[in-house]
Structure formats: C-alpha cells, structure tokens
Amino acid sequence: MRPWASIPLALLLCAAFSRADCAQDHRSNKNAGILVTDFTISGTQTISATELARMTGNLIGSCFDDDPEELGERIRALFQDRGYFTAEVKHVGFKPGDPLAIPKPVTMDADVAEGPLYKLAEITFVDNHAISTDRLRQAFPLKKGSIFSRTKVASGIDALRRLYGSRGFLDYNAVVDSEPSSNATMSLKLSIQEGPQYHMGKLEIVAAKEVADRLRLQWKLPEGAVYDYTYLDKYISANRDLLPSGFTRDRVQAGADCPHALVDLKLIIDAAEDKSPQPKNVACEKTKEDPK
C-alpha cells in the first residue's frame, strides 16, 4: 500500500481522539463550540479566593457555544446565586488551545464587579385565597434576612407549585417581582394565580385483569376527591412490586378538563392491552378580563 493512502484514515483517527468529553454539554451544535479547561475571575473586591474557586469550578470542564455574551450571562448567574444581584460582567475572554479540536479547548477569563451582597428584606404574597400567607411563606426556602439567591427563588416557586398541586390547583402560576433597595436588601412580591381546584375523575388501568384489579385496589384517591398531583408518585413508589421495572409517571396519561375541573388518568401497564383513546385536556374559555 502506498504511504499516502493511509493519511485519510490517520486524519479521521486524530479527529476522533480530538473530541473531548464534556462534564456538562450546553452546546447548540455538537460539532462546534468550546471546552473550558481553565477559568479565572478578576476585578472582585469582597469575595474570597475559596468562593471564587467554587464559582469557576462550576464551568471548568463543561462545553458551551463559542459566545462570550452567553458565557457572561452564565457567569452573572453564578454571582446572583450568591446574593450579588447587581453583579456586572465587564469582559469575557477566551484563549484557545488546539484550534483543530472539537470542541475547542479554551482558557477563559472574566472581569467582574460584584456589587453589594443583597439579603431578603421581605416577601409578600398577593391574590392567594386557597392557601394562607403563613403556609406559603413556610414552604418558601428563602427567609427574611437570608442571602438573596435566584436559585432559591426558583426552587421556592417550584415548592409552591407542589404545594398548590397537592391541593388540586394544577393551573397555579406565580408572577415574581423583585425590588432592590439602597441598603442592599431585596423585597420580593409573588402575585398568585390559583386557577380552579381540580378533582379526581376516572381512573383507567391498562393491564391484564388480575394485575389491573390489584392495582386498582391500592388506589386510594377516589373519584370526586380533591386531586393531589403528588399522590401518583407516592402510589408508584408504594406499588413497585406490582408495576413493571422502571415504571414512572411518564407512563401515565392525564387529561385535565378545566371547565369541569376534573383529571382523568390512564396507567399503561401493558401497551398491548391499550384499546382506548388518550384522556383529553380541555381548556377553560378565556374571559374578556383575562389578559392571557
């Protein structure tokens, strides 16, 4: 074989080995992008070297689009998660390594002015009727005087969603408004949209009769009862011995009928037994006052 005939294969092998593993892959195009091999932050005034190391460690080893603006937003989010709500990312720079590698390894640096450390001054809830303000505040992980973290705000909204869902309010939504003060505190207001309270509709279990009868016997949420969104997970966990291996709520079809405030469920244990249509979602008609 002529020596040059093996060159294309060699190039293919080199290209294959140049594709680095990403700890987390955030690229929109898997055949491009960058791999952050090192990351330094400069310009901060009050943050310790230990805390900066934790922040840079969140991005080192991960892959991103070759977009300094996007990385700047991610870096800003790291600061906001630690209470630096007005942090300003002044510059993000890349120093590339091997230009032929996919993704391209880079050393990243960022110039950041962190600003003041914000704490929560107060949290208020508006338009909540079904659940008391005290109960909502108890479920929210961000407490008065604690560092204002955007991650905790997001987890708090999810916690309220679970709480409302457990009481049948499946259309719950919260509009969040945050207002910073000159004394480095943040006031948080959540405007609650509860929607209708749903009740349990029909339960269909798609399985052989013996299995379906046993599973139905274990179902403790009767038709007409307030629908608890969290009950299905508890039911699946408690009946693992009756359910197929790896069964999750993704195998359950749900249809929410908003006008009648009912939820029909269909548990598909054996797809071969499935002869009925999927439960339908029926939306409520929007009123003239409804801004949506």
Language model regions located:
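Positively charged n-region of N-terminal signal peptides that target proteins for export
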Residues: M1-A5
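Interaction-mediating elements
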Residues: D21-K292
